[in-house]
Swiss-Prot record:
Coiled coil: none annotated. This is ATP phosphoribosyltransferase regulatory subunit. The lineage of its organism: Bacteria, Pseudomonadati, Pseudomonadota, Alphaproteobacteria, Hyphomicrobiales. Required for the first step of histidine biosynthesis. May allow the feedback regulation of ATP phosphoribosyltransferase activity by histidine. Heteromultimer composed of HisG and HisZ subunits. It comes from Brucella canis (strain ATCC 23365 / NCTC 10854 / RM-666).
Length: 376
């Protein structure tokens, strides 16, 4: 494993986390797989190490910390606001590099001031990285899924298409395919007739049964990856979406929006000008955007050193607002040192009885170790 629990970086990060008013929690290595398969996003789903217990329940090696930390909070029925820190191994299938590596981070749950807690998350992540690599050239990229969602609403897109495009947010290839589909320029492979009839009728239950039977016949476990019900729902949704096309002028505006990439100190002005020039109602989301930018400045972070990229998202489905990454500016290929964002619906999806907002970040210790030049 790259990055050892006995390394100076591990111990230094423990000190940093302890200094940030967060309770250090221990999370079991073996986790129920369904929450990750349902909520973590396609990219992470493909990388999970899956297994089953003797009862046939799907389990996995812990692929990340946010979901299990939130589940632990719900199980304890803990009061909020509450800050949790973690430091330990995660397991992901990767083409290059070790499948087991260390992550550290903080999850901030239930804070009432969204702008202040967003800014604190970014400031904490940046401080932890700089504590280990104080002289490293860093690049900070920030996006906002809620601004993108506001843009889709302002353009008048149907709800189904908004959901599809939000799932593609941050993935340039997926977004290009979705936009091509929306314009009717993307050819779709036809389904087998037996499936196509059920899709056309919107028969989700019948379709799921047929898919499950075909998976079992092919020797594929229905619990591995997407479930038959989820696949059926997606196929029916795709059929509904295929019947909707959108004016080229509106799609051109969406592409112009996604091309916005400016420093954070000019981002709000740029977005307001874009909205005004194109008669788009983005007032509510931009007020939140500006409040967060002000809070980031008050946290002592230079806004001119942060890039706002309107197309930037992170490959996890549970984010709802702020997303950010801190990168090694000298390594464009694999230079993400820390990443985080806001996930205000996640705890409700995991079973919390009331809405609990959340924001957090994770640090990759192996990459930080390589950047800091630590000797083994």
């Amino acid at each position: 494993m790259v990055g050892s629990r006995t390394s100076p970086i591990f111990n230094a990060l423990r000190v940093e986390l302890n200094a940030r008013e967060a309770e250090l929690v221990e999370i079991p290595l073996i986790q129920p797989a369904d929450p990750f398969l349902d909520m973590a996003g396609e990219d992470l789903r493909r990388r999970i190490f899956l297994t089953e217990n003797e009862n046939g329940d799907s389990l996995c090696l812990r692929p990340e910390f946010t979901i299990p930390v939130c589940r632990n909070h719900i199980a304890l029925n803990a009061a909020t606001p509450k800050r949790y820190a973690y430091l330990g191994e995660v397991f992901r299938q990767r083409r290059d590099g070790a499948a087991e590596f260390l992550q550290a981070g903080i999850e901030d749950l239930g804070a009432a001031d969204e702008a202040a807690s967003d800014a604190r998350s970014l400031a904490d992540a940046l401080s932890c990285v700089k504590a280990i690599a104080p002289d490293a050239p860093l690049e900070i990229v920030l996006g906002d899924q809620s601004v993108f969602a506001g843009m889709l609403k302002a353009l008048g897109l149907p709800q189904g298409w908004r959901k599809k495009l939000l799932r593609s947010f941050g993935d340039a290839h997926s977004m290009d395919l979705a936009l091509a589909e929306l314009t009717g320029t993307q050819r779709r492979d036809p389904l087998p007739e037996s499936l196509a009839v059920l899709v056309a009728e919107g028969d989700e239950i019948g379709l799921a049964r047929m898919l499950e039977a075909e998976m079992l016949e092919a020797g594929i476990s229905p619990g591995a990856g997407r479930t038959p019900v989820e696949i059926a729902r997606r196929l029916i949704e795709k059929e509904d979406l295929a019947a909707t096309h959108f004016p080229a002028a509106a799609l051109d505006l969406l592409r112009q929006f996604l091309a916005i990439r400016v420093s954070l100190d000019t981002a709000a002005v740029t977005l307001r000008a874009f909205a005004a020039d194109n008669a788009l109602d983005l007032g509510a989301v931009l007020q939140k955007f500006e409040a967060r930018a002000d809070a980031i400045a008050q946290a002592g972070i230079e806004m001119k050193d942060i890039i706002y990229d309107a197309s930037f998202g992170r490959p996890l489905d549970y984010y709802t607002g702020l997303v950010y990454e801190i990168r090694d500016a000298s390594n464009r290929q694999d230079g993400v040192l820390a990443g985080g964002g806001r996930y205000d619906r996640l705890l409700t999806m995991l079973g919390a009885c009331e809405a609990i907002p959340g924001v957090g970040f994770s640090i990759w210790l192996d990459r930080l170790q390589a950047l800091a030049g630590e000797k083994q």
